[in-house]
Structures are given as structure tokens and as C-alpha cells.
From Swiss-Prot:
Key words, A-Z: Apoptosis, Host Golgi apparatus, Host membrane, Membrane, Transmembrane, Transmembrane helix
Main location: host cell
Family under the similarity heading: Belongs to the gammacoronaviruses E protein family.
Name under which the protein is recorded: Envelope small membrane protein
HAMAP family listed in its UniProt record: GAMMA_CORONA_E
Species annotation: Avian infectious bronchitis virus (strain M41) (IBV)
One GO cellular component, as annotated: membrane
Localization annotation: Host Golgi apparatus membrane
Positions in the Virion surface compartment: 1-11
Composition bias type Polar residues, residue spans: 90-101
Described function: Plays a central role in virus morphogenesis and assembly. Acts as a viroporin and self-assembles in host membranes forming pentameric protein-lipid pores that allow ion transport. Also plays a role in the induction of apoptosis.
Spans annotated as Disordered: 89-109
Amino acid sequence: MMNLLNKSLEENGSFLTALYIIVGFLALYLLGRALQAFVQAADACCLFWYTWVVIPGAKGTAFVYKYTYGRKLNNPELEAVIVNEFPKNGWNNKNPANFQDAQRDKLYS
């Protein structure tokens, strides 16, 4: 770094070398400000999409689910079917399935 500075001082003089250094720092400053503006714009964009698209979309989906499929799933008859008529020995068991009759408290094979 000092070698480069000494070479610039010899070839261009102290005024131009100082001017080049100042212009270099000014360029770095402007690059930083441009990057800051870009990050701020990206942050505002993400905040906009999150506030106006993601949250309302999730709330809308939850609302629709709650008042359509959610109501249907909270049906006691459906729960009785799922609990009582599903094979008690799992999906992949080779043995015959065991079913339970809820009204008569009997097991069927």
C-alpha cells in the first residue's frame, strides 16, 4: 500500500495523490449509500409483501378452513368412523385387520 502511495506521489505529485484518495473515499461513501438505499428498498418491499400478502393470506386461509373444512371435521359421527372403523393393527400389518363395533363393544377380525 505504501509502495503504491509513494509511486503515486512521485508520478502525480501530492495534490493529485490527495485528490485521488479523496475521490476514492467519496466513491466508497457513495457506494455505501447506494447499498444502504438498496437494502432499505428491499426491506420495505419485504415488509410490504409480508404485511399485505403473507399475513392476510394466512389469516384468510385459516378463516376459510375454520368455517368450511374445520366445521366438517369436528363432526362427532366422522370422529366415530375414524376411531372405531380404522384397523387397530396399523397400515402394513399382514394379519387381518381388527375392527371394533362401537355400538356393540365387539371386536371383529
